Amino acid sequence: MFNFRRRKAASFPDEEILNYGLKLAMEFGKNWLQPIQTRLSKKHPELTMEQLDAYNDICQKAMKCGHDCVYSMESGLTDKQMFERLDAQLSVDFGWVSRKNRSKLFSQGMYYRWKDLG
């Protein structure tokens, strides 16, 4: 199994694939909350099924972490403060997540927070 939580760039050649996989995991519409293996294999046919499964697992975990982090924050924080907390949490747990994906995770988390909590 791969260790995708490491932040070191030199030992982390799959950062681009991880971010693409996370982008796929966050797609709304018919692919929402669906596994990413088939879609990921279209862009990266060199990946084995074991690798595709590992990418799916870690990307789904990163997405859930981002959504849960935003959803569970206390009331009264500004959007900027909430994003900074999400950014800090992702830096610890999923340091490979790109700035663009962090922003999208924040937006999705805020949507669910607003939808469920008002």
Question: Where do the PLM segments sit?
Answer:
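Charged, amphipathic alpha-helical regulatory modules used
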Residues: 3-118
